[in-house]
């Protein structure tokens, strides 16, 4: 679990270190809302939002990713204090 205040920092740190096609998943404590980040290429990411709204953000660079995560943090996790955090590795 990660603190909501560390959400963006942990997400950005993790996506830089995962392999291409791996995903990072963040869920609320109740696990009813989630944000999933997929690394599609070096420096390019897809973000899917599944919770209050369902939306997909495609081909984001690191700067756009940070901006999108700030937006999603306010929208999907407004009252959350802790988030479940999981790295989903693709099989080779």
Model-derived features with residue positions:
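Negatively charged, low-complexity tracts enriched in Asp/Glu with abundant Ser/Thr
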Residues: 1-28, 51-74, 87, 91-92
């Amino acid at each position: 679990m990660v603190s909501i205040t560390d959400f963006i920092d942990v997400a950005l740190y993790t996506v830089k270190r995962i392999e291409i096609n791996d995903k990072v998943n963040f869920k609320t404590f109740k696990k009813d809302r989630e944000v999933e980040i997929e690394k599609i290429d070096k420096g390019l990411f897809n973000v899917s939002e599944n919770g209050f709204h369902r939306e997909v953000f495609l081909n984001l660079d690191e700067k756009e990713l940070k901006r999108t995560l700030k937006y999603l943090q306010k929208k999907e996790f407004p009252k959350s204090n802790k988030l479940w955090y999981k790295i989903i590795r693709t099989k080779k």
